[in-house]
Amino acid sequence: MGSFWRICASERLKMSKSYIWLLVILSPAIAILPGALSIRDGEEVTWGLLLSVMSVVHGLLFLPVLSGIFAALICRYEHQDGGWKLLLSLPVTRMKVYLSKYVMIIALLGVVQLLFLVCLLGMGWIRDAAAPVPWSILLFSVFGGWIACLPLAALQLAVSQGWSSFGAPLALNVSLTIPNILIANSATYGPYYPWVQPSLAMTPNGQDGFGAFNLPLDSLMIVVLGSLIVFLVAGLFFFWRKAV
């Protein structure tokens, strides 16, 4: 177990030399804009309103894109100058290497979600949202969005470690994120589309009663956990057979 955390520490050290931390604050910062502009005629600003409008931009567009960017950056160093061969020649197992990269991706996404919560609380304070703060709703939304990112992160890691090109996985990820607005309207396909799941998990119940947003959270989590197992096992299998 100690070797696994040492690999994680080395991954963190590699990421500290990049501009990845600027990307971490990107989506929460952009989500501030719709929160600042949200208003309904004759209605007071509520925490549910702020969470709804800020999570649309954050969960529907930027969070899925960030998962792909993080995965591509995590694998970028190994794709250069025979990095995979050098890394796997060390006394470490492929499973530990793969899982350490996955842990780094979901840790970065966790930091993104925490920053989103901070921005949401700050915007609520600035807009003088109706008290008290609904901590249970906000925390369930933020944590649920992070959980819903886990299968997408596993899928993106599987693609990024398999393709040596840095831009190809990103282009694929963006192209599959763009249809989110349409797919989220489908109660049939929306819950099973990994790029939509973070937004579905983050949207407060009762705010968007249409399409896949009608799906109960517990049913969505069953789909998410099932997808996570499939994508993570498949990624490990292909990485285990990867020629270096």
Task: Show which residues each predicted segment covers.
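Aromatic- and glycine-rich beta-strand/loop motifs that create alpha-glucan
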Residues: M1-I25
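Hydrophobic alpha-helical transmembrane segments of multi-pass membrane transport/permease proteins
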Residues: K17-D41, S55-F70, A171-I181, G226
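Membrane-helix interface segments
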Residues: Y19-I20, D81, T93-M95, L99, ...
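Secretory targeting signals
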Residues: A29-S67, L99-W163, Q207, N214-D218
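Terminal transmembrane helical anchor/hairpin motif
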Residues: P34, S38-L50, L170-V244
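Helix-loop-helix units of permease transmembrane domains in multi-pass membrane transporters
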Residues: I74-I106
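Transmembrane helix-loop junction
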Residues: Y77, L90, L121-W125, Q161, ...
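Functionally important transmembrane alpha-helices
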Residues: P151-I181
